[in-house]
């Protein structure tokens, strides 16, 4: 878990010549891989798509121009044009200034809204787990993601987007939403879930 040199993996990718590379390595390893992949020149030949944990705004600020050309698949970005997201991002900026906001904060915000909706859906002094779970599954929240609900296996059903790295007015790179790639997409195994929602 402390690998810093990815020369062997990059050589394997170069030899294999795949149509694309999907990378998921959050934190320092992901930063090292991304920088070395860009330095190798492979990004010009073989596109890279990453998980949002591998390239959020914090990481973009660290790697800078090394992120140019990388694509991200994500269910949230700070430029989403919906009222709840605009309110959330404005509140974040008011409290934290220019500290980068990531999908972790957005998920935490939505999770708190879901918990509140679940609690509002039960009554009495004691909370029954079944009743609470049922209230969660039927909860309607004003999500920062836009359309959002929980599927039968309690995993999100949500839209997914392609993000790219753009240059801001200040000359610094940032993540920009390019297009929606999936609508109301849930866990493909949800139908096989044996969990009793009732």
Where are these regions (language model features)?
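Solvent-exposed, acidic/polar segments of extracytosolic/periplasmic ligand-binding ectodomains
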Residues: 137-198
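Extracellular/periplasmic periplasmic-binding protein-like sensory domains
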Residues: 36-109, 120-123, 169, 175-197
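An alpha-helix initiation/capping motif
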Residues: 27, 105-113, 130
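Surface-exposed patches in mature extracellular/periplasmic domains of secreted proteins
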Residues: 99-106, 126-129, 147-151
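Short, charged, surface-exposed loops that flank catalytic or proteolytic processing sites
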Residues: 120-134
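Extracellular/periplasmic Venus flytrap/periplasmic-binding protein
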Residues: 1-40, 79-87
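Alpha-helical elements of the RecA-like P-loop NTPase motor core of helicases
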Residues: 31, 57, 113
